Amino acid sequence: MNISATVTVRDLATGIPGATRVFENFGIDYCCGGHRTLADACQEAGLPVEDLTRSLEEAGSAPQPGSGRDWRQESLTALTEYIIDTYHFFTRQELDRLENLFDRVCSRHSENHPELFEAQKTFYQLKQDLIPHMLKEEQVLFPYITRMEEAAVEVRAIPTPFFNTVRNPVRMMMTEHDTAGDLLRQLRGVTKGYTTPPDGCVSYQTLCQALAAFEADLHHHIHLENNILFPRAVEMEETSAPDFYKSAGEFNEHRCFGR
């Protein structure tokens, strides 16, 4: 893939194996902010575009761990199942673990580090948002995407859902992704980049490490939905029901790929 300053972060994240790890290392938002060009993202982060380009080239030529599945080519049903089994499972598991860690660390260190209460409050808001968010995806949006794909494969009409068009829940999910991204940035700021203070105990260190890992996982989770699943679902529905889309108006592709 051609790597240049004018290519969007989204296209680099989906087209280059290992690109998401590079973006994580440089602090580049590739999930909710994937619509920006590489040049714009570097300017916002205060980074030389040459450094990021070089790292992306190295990542693209390096052997990649894992399954190596190209989710741009796999079925949408397989992708939704992967998201649920891998990311939703991990998110629920870690939210409970992080809540317990916050309780423990706040009880021991809040006197010297009152900012912990702000971090805990932000985390609770994130948890309260993510739990129903994942349920809506699992119970409403993802099943419809599966039914839509089955109808497309069998060349039959797509059943009209109660939400009229897949674009409506997609917009809602992406708005909620934006909120989650904002809360993660607040958490990172309050904790000074998930840094353990000199007087922090092992539990404090574990909390900071777990928050950093949770952030990276949620970034990739949202990337798969915002930049691959949702655009493909919208495109499939549009291709299967072009007359409906003509009357409904254009879908804002840039909004689908991030703010």
Feature locations, PLM:
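Small-residue-biased structural context
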Residues: 1-259
